[in-house]
Amino acid sequence: MDRAAIAADSDSGLADLSIYLAAGEGKLDPSRKPDFVKKALTQDRILRLESKGKGSLVVTSCFGCGANKSWDTTLTIVWRGGKFLVAGYSRDWDWNVQKADGSVETTLGGCDINFLTGRGVASKDLDDGKPVAGKFVPIALADWSDDSRPEPCEF
């Protein structure tokens, strides 16, 4: 059985992901070093770390977490070809900006990119998601950063 853990770096406050392969069923030996560490996976608040079907690991985080300016992000990680890959990326946002005249401008949207199939959808406002142009390919988890976020997932 594999294990994963998220911990905030004491200096930066960024979330570091540690993965332990073949960790067994019992308690994890605290002296064991992780098989893989992704430093600074996200600066957002981690909501969930889940194991999904076919051996994927899903990390869900949020910025603002329901505030006037917020988004949530889901990163799907898989083990393929001897390395960890980002297989999927989803992001939903609700961004409210108070204007000088007192009105509020709201930007809603979302994206869902499957790097394994090379396809994705994006939505703006309350529209249904539409396929996005481009070919998406898996990204090594070691190379992932917020700068790797696909263009359709920007707002």
Name every feature range the model reports, one short phrase each.
Residues 14-33, 76-81:
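Beta-propeller blade repeat segments, especially FG-GAP/WD-type strand-to-loop junctions
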Residues 25-44, 133, 138-140:
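Blade-edge motifs of beta-propeller repeat domains
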Residues 4-13, 96:
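Short, charge-rich amphipathic segments
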Residues 42-54:
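Beta-propeller blade termini
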Residues 10-15, 68-71:
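Short, solvent-exposed loop/turn segments at conserved positions within beta-propeller repeat blades
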Residues 4, 34, 42-44, 60-62, ...:
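Sparse, context-dependent recognition of short Cys/His-centered cofactor- or disulfide-binding micro-motifs
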Residues 1-8, 52-63:
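Acidic/hydrophobic-patterned starts of short beta strands in beta-sheet-rich repeat architectures
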Residues 55-155:
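Acidic, small-residue rich beta-repeat scaffolds with periodic aromatic anchors
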